[in-house]
């Protein structure tokens, strides 16, 4: 319970009563209260308490004020309180009922303000079942008395007693239901009351844990409790009459579940991994292991202590590490961590509750794996004091020597990787050392060409060190040194020209045979006494030759600055110098001839063609000059007209505009349209000057008002060249040949088509209403024809041959016809096909011949034919019903048919 110093003692009793009633109705204060947050602190202890044993921890709330609070116990002979609120036993003694309850006081050192809290200590339950309490031993909780009115003011009477919380150990073995307290109202003497409890654990989940006898008010627990699930139950007790009317205000009943040490500590990880650099000093932090206990952390059951059970390996000391028993921090306690000897340590860590009490505490273990990390405590060391190598001269990017070192540090780490450098013997920087990342070897490499004639041997001083500096306190030198002897091998080198290119200045127009200069190549291998010969490699204009022995260059043609092979007045030629070494080597040199201009080109008129009108007005011709020479052998130019022929100066006049341009105009008033060649004399400014008569083709044409030639004149004036005319004629001839070939091909195709039509089966020739009677159904049933009957019979007597008369095909025959009729007028071919073909040819040759020659015999259909006689087929109508006069218009071949159908009764 807490008391506020300087409380409102001067306030009216009514205000105090109202304020206290309001606070009790709300159940809690909204503002922070200085003091103990709990009304009662409880702990479960063994029967025997040892001296110095921590019992529990009480907390004090300062409300964020910097108060200096001093604790003291109401039983100082048995208990003391530390500054952090931990309660210790002053002496060893068996815990009795008298010592199970005491008070703890907290006093502000500055204001002397004082607070107190009750402490209840409970004995651990024995393994045997607790005996049932006698009825007279059951505690009672009586409802407080109601407020009474005195003199018009409310006044609360004192309670019979303060309702303390009920402490109930977890995991109780019963028997159940186990009686706790009896709830009673002092009005049960006059009324018949009924008691009940509400809240979590009674009528709210988890329901049925606490029950009350409605008549006697006996409150009981029905099952063992588990503090790790619910540490406190808050119930409300009610008292009503038999009609259900409330008799007493509900009272709060708090049931604290007293913690039992029923949970072992559990590590957050079964295996913990940490690391520490080798060579670390004692006290170096390594890692932290953490375990948790589900029991009450404010009681001994949840207070853990750590310790190291074992260390493997145990070298160089079995106790290389220690652990803070409260925080779990692992630190080093001994020197001598060396990764090259021991790379990893394995520790077995134990966590025990009850503050590490080995007798009562529960424990658990975990593994801590500590890796010793590498530091640079071993410098690289060369495996030899001197290394040897050789390199051909003028070679670069060649590995000369391979430097090897040893390093005991962890491979492929900055403490193991070697860095090489050349500390002496290479003032010009011709060598470099690269590090092989796999083997850590140093590769001595040539980075600049070496001349054998200048340096035949190098002695290099090299050093090797790690990428990171050595760790502090290491006695070894930070680097290792060695020497490298490099021998240079002589090789045949290329001859070279100096200078290259060689530039000379000469005037153009030099005659052939003129000696220009001498190209001389140098041989770097002066100790080999080799001969050099010269050849021409590139001479675009073929103007030069070179002496193969002494390198003299002579012209073989006239040098011309205006040649297309000369660029910017410079002519380039390339020559080759070769020695007779083994193997032979060669080098190239370039000769650049800067050609000086002379006045060797006469100027020409530009443009070479122009047009003007028939009259002097309204336009004129502007001309200029083209000279391939350069100043001072070019412009300014002089323009003039020649004296002959006389018509030139009579018809034309020229006026100089400036040094580069002149103007040509008609001198006469009218010049007939046409093309005129006007010679113009142009003179340059060379010394001596050079003149030229250049022809300007001028087209004189009719002009419009704007001074432009009309289209008619342009068309008339346009001329075709001979080549163009020949090409046009060739195209016309080829076109005519193609047309002729196409006509011949068409004629030939028509003849072939006509010949094929003569052989067309009459079945395909259907004209108007001409019917075909040679088709009698789905084909002949008898396919065994006697082809000999279709041939000319030789055994028939002449008097037996009876001519066949011409008759209508749609009329029944009047008399019986012979079975095998024979054409008497037919020749005697051996096959009926030949007979038909000959008849067709005769009809084609004689257009006036009647068509009966092509009549076929249809009355023989083979032996055994089931077809009836064709004469049995009657026409559906008489011949007079139809008009067949149009058959006369079909030509001679249908004349017979026209007579048969169009001749009436005849």
Curated annotation (Swiss-Prot):
Cleaved by MMP24. Ectodomain cleavage leads to the generation of a soluble 90 kDa N-terminal soluble fragment and a 45 kDa membrane-bound C-terminal fragment 1 (CTF1), which is further cleaved by gamma-secretase into a 35 kDa. Cleavage in neural stem cells by MMP24 affects CDH2-mediated anchorage of neural stem cells to ependymocytes in the adult subependymal zone, leading to modulate neural stem cell quiescence. May be phosphorylated by OBSCN. It is found in: Cell membrane; Cell membrane, Sarcolemma; Cell junction; Cell surface. The modification Phosphoserine is found at residue 96. Pfam families: CADH_Y-type_LIR, Cadherin, Cadherin_pro. Ca(2+) 1 binds at residues 170, 226, 228, 262. Residues 863-880 have a biased composition (Low complexity). GO terms for cellular component: adherens junction; apical part of cell; apical plasma membrane; apicolateral plasma membrane; basolateral plasma membrane; catenin complex; cell junction; cell surface. The keyword Cytoplasm does not apply. Changing residue 740 to P: Decrease in PCDH8-binding; alone or. Glycans are attached at residues 190, 273, 325, 402, 572, 622, 651, 692. Residues 160-267, 268-382, 383-497, 498-603, 604-717 form the Cadherin domain. Residues 863-883 are annotated as: Disordered. It is a single-pass type I membrane protein. Calcium-dependent cell adhesion protein; preferentially mediates homotypic cell-cell adhesion by dimerization with a CDH2 chain from another cell. Cadherins may thus contribute to the sorting of heterogeneous cell types. Acts as a regulator of neural stem cells quiescence by mediating anchorage of neural stem cells to ependymocytes in the adult subependymal zone: upon cleavage by MMP24, CDH2-mediated anchorage is affected, leading to modulate neural stem cell quiescence. Three calcium ions are usually bound at the interface of each cadherin domain and rigidify the connections, imparting a strong curvature to the full-length ectodomain. Calcium-binding sites are occupied sequentially in the order of site 3, then site 2 and site 1. This is Cadherin-2. It comes from Rattus norvegicus. The gene is Cdh2.
């Amino acid at each position: 319970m807490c008391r506020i110093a300087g409380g409102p003692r001067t306030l009216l009793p009514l205000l105090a009563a109202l304020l206290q009633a309001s606070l009790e109705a709300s159940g809690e204060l909204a503002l922070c209260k200085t003091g103990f947050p709990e009304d009662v602190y409880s702990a479960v202890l063994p029967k025997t308490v040892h001296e110095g044993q921590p019992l529990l921890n009480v907390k004090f709330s300062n409300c964020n004020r910097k108060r200096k609070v001093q604790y003291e116990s109401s039983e100082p002979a048995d208990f003391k309180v530390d500054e952090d609120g931990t309660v210790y036993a002053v002496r060893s003694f068996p815990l009795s009922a008298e010592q199970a309850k005491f008070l703890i006081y907290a006093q502000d050192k500055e204001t002397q303000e004082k607070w107190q809290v009750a402490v209840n200590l409970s004995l651990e339950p024995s393994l045997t079942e607790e005996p049932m309490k006698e009825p007279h031993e059951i505690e009672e909780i009586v409802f407080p008395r109601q407020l009474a009115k005195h003199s018009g003011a409310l006044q609360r009477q004192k309670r019979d007693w303060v309702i303390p919380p009920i402490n109930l150990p977890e995991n109780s073995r019963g028997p159940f239901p186990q009686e706790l307290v009896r709830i009673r109202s002092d009005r049960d003497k006059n009324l018949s009351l009924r008691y009940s409890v509400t809240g979590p654990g009674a009528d709210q989940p988890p329901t049925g844990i606490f029950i009350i006898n409605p008549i006697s008010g006996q409150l009981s627990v029905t099952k063992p409790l588990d503090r790790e699930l619910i540490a406190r139950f808050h119930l409300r007790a009610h008292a009503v009459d038999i009609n259900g009317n409330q008799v007493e205000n509900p009272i709060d009943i708090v049931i604290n579940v007293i913690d039992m040490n029923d949970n072992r500590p559990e590590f957050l990880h079964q295996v913990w991994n940490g690391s520490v650099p080798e060579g670390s000093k004692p006290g170096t932090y390594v890692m932290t292991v953490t375990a948790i206990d589900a029991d009450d952390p404010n009681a001994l059951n949840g207070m853990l202590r750590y310790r190291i059970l074992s260390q493997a390996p145990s070298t160089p000391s079995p106790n290389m590490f220690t652990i803070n028993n409260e925080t779990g921090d692992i630190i080093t306690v001994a020197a001598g961590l060396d990764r090259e000897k021991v790379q990893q340590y394995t520790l077995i860590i134990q966590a025990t509750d009850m503050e590490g009490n080995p007798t009562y505490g529960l424990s658990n273990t975990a593994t801590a794996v500590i890796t010793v990390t590498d530091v640079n405590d071993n410098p690289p060391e060369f495996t030899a004091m001197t290394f040897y190598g050789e390199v051909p001269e003028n070679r670069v990017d060649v590995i000369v020597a391979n430097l090897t070192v040893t390093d005991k540090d962890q491979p492929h780490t900055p403490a193991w990787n070697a860095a090489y450098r050349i500390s002496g013997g290479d003032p010009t920087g011709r060598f470099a050392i690269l590090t092989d990342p796999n083997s850590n070897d140093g590769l001595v490499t040539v980075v600049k060409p070496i001349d054998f004639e200048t340096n035949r041997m190098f002695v290099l001083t090299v050093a090797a060190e790690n990428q990171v500096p050595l760790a502090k306190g290491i006695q070894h030198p930070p680097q290792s040194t060695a020497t490298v002897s490099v021998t240079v091998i002589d090789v045949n080198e290329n001859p070279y020209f100096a200078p290259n290119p060689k530039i000379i200045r000469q005037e153009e127009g030099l005659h052939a045979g003129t000696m220009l200069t001498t190209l001389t190549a140098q041989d770097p291998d002066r100790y080999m006494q080799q001969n050099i010969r010269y050849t021409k490699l590139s001479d675009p204009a073929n103007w030069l030759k070179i002496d193969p022995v002494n390198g003299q260059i002579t012209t073989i043609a006239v040098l011309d600055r205006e040649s297309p092979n000369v660029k910017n007045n410079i002519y380039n030629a390339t020559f080759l110098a070769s020695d007779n070494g083994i193997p032979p080597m060669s080098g190239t040199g370039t000769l650049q001839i800067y050609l000086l201009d002379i006045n060797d080109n006469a100027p020409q008129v530009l443009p070479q063609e122009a047009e003007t009108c028939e009259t002097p007005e309204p336009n004129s011709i502007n001309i200029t000059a083209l000279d391939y020479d350069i100043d001072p052998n070019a412009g300014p130019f002089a323009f003039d007209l020649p004296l002959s022929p006389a018509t030139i100066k009579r018809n034309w006049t020229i006026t100089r505009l400036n040094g580069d341009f002149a103007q040509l105009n008609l001198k006469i008033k009218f010049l007939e349209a046409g093309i005129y060649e006007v010679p113009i004399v142009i003179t340059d400014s060379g010394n001596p000057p050079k003149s030229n008569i250049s022809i300007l083709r001028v087209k004189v044409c009719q002009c419009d008002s704007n001074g432009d030639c009309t289209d008619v004149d342009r068309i008339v004036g346009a001329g075709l060249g001979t080549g163009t005319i020949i090409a046009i004629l060739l195209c016309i001839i080829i076109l005519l040949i193609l047309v002729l070939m196409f006509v011949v091909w068409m004629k030939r195709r028509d003849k072939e088509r006509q010949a094929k039509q003569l052989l067309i089966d009459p079945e395909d020739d259907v004209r108007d209403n001409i019917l075909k009677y040679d088709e009698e159904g789905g084909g002949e049933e008898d396919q065994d024809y006697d082809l000999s009957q279709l041939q000319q019979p030789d055994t028939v007597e002449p008097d037996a041959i009876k001519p066949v008369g011409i008759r209508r095909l749609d009329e029944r025959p009047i008399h019986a016809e012979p079975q095998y009729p024979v054409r008497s007028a037919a020749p005697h071919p051996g096959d009926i096909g030949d007979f038909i073909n000959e008849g067709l040819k005769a009809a084609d040759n004689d257009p006036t011949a009647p068509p009966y020659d092509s009549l076929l015999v249809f009355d023989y259909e083979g032996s055994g034919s089931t077809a009836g006689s064709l004469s049995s087929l009657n026409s559906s109508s008489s011949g007079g019903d139809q008009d067949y006069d149009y058959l006369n218009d079909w030509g001679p071949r249908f004349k017979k048919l026209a007579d048969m159908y169009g001749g009436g009764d005849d």
